[in-house]
A protein has these predicted regions:
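Short loop/turn and low-complexity linker motifs enriched in small/turn-promoting residues
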Residues: 19-56, 65-188
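Sec-dependent bacterial lipoprotein signal peptides
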Residues: 1-17
Length: 188
C-alpha cells in the first residue's frame, strides 16, 4: 500500500510538472487596449491584463495590433520551457532569494550562494540578487520559479527534511511591484 501511494504521488507530481512546461504569460503592461494574435488565435488585451497561454515547444508567430488595426509588431519567437511575452516592452526584474531551514545559517549561506548587490528603483535602494531583463525583448524565456501571477512564498515547506537545508528560488516582478514584495519578504 505504501509503495502504491508513493507511486501515485510521484506520478501526480510528474504530470503537474509536465503541464507547467510551455506556459507563457501574456501581459499587457501598457495603458492602451491591444490585440495580440499568437498562431492565428487572437487575444483581446485590456490595459494591465494578463492571460496564461499554453504553447507547445517550438516557433510561434505573433502579431500585435492596436484598436484601429494598425500593426504595432509582427515577429516570431521560440518557446522551450515557457516564459513571458513582453508585448508592451515593460521593465521586469528577476529576484533570486535563498530559503533555509535554520536561521543561524542564513548570513553564511547568503554570502556563498547569492551575488547580492544594490539596485535602485525610484530613488530607493534594495539589496539582493536581481537581474534586470531586456525590456526590448519580445519573448523572455523563463529562468524563474514563480511567474507574475504567483506569490513569492515567505517560506518553503520540507527544507528541514531535505539533504540540503536550503534552496534558491527565483521570481519575476514588474519593476514597480518589486519594492512592495521586497518589504514584505525581508521582514521574514
Amino acid at each position: 500500500m505504501k509503495y502504491s501511494l508513493n507511486f501515485y504521488l510521484i506520478l501526480s507530481l510528474m504530470l503537474f510538472v509536465a503541464c507547467e512546461e510551455g506556459n507563457v504569460e501574456l501581459y499587457n503592461a501598457g495603458d492602451d487596449f491591444i490585440y495580440v494574435t499568437v498562431d492565428e488565435l487572437r487575444h483581446d488585451m485590456a490595459p494591465h491584463s494578463m492571460k496564461l497561454l499554453e504553447l507547445k515547444k517550438g516557433r510561434h508567430k505573433i502579431v500585435i495590433t492596436d484598436r484601429e488595426g494598425k500593426t504595432l509588431e509582427e515577429d516570431t519567437f521560440e518557446v522551450n520551457k515557457g516564459g513571458l511575452l513582453n508585448v508592451s516592452k515593460h521593465s521586469y526584474i528577476v529576484w533570486t532569494d535563498l530559503y533555509w531551514a535554520s536561521s543561524e545559517e542564513n548570513s553564511k549561506l547568503r554570502e556563498t550562494k547569492l551575488q547580492e548587490e544594490a539596485l535602485e528603483i525610484d530613488g530607493q535602494e534594495y539589496v539582493g540578487e536581481f537581474q534586470e531583463l531586456d525590456e526590448e525583448q519580445l519573448f523572455i524565456e523563463s529562468e524563474w520559479d514563480y511567474g507574475l501571477g504567483e506569490e513569492f512564498p515567505a517560506s518553503l515547506w520540507g527544507l528541514e527534511f531535505a539533504q540540503e537545508k536550503w534552496s534558491i528560488k527565483r521570481k519575476i516582478f514588474r519593476k514597480k511591484e518589486l519594492a512592495e514584495a521586497y518589504m514584505k519578504l525581508v521582514k521574514r
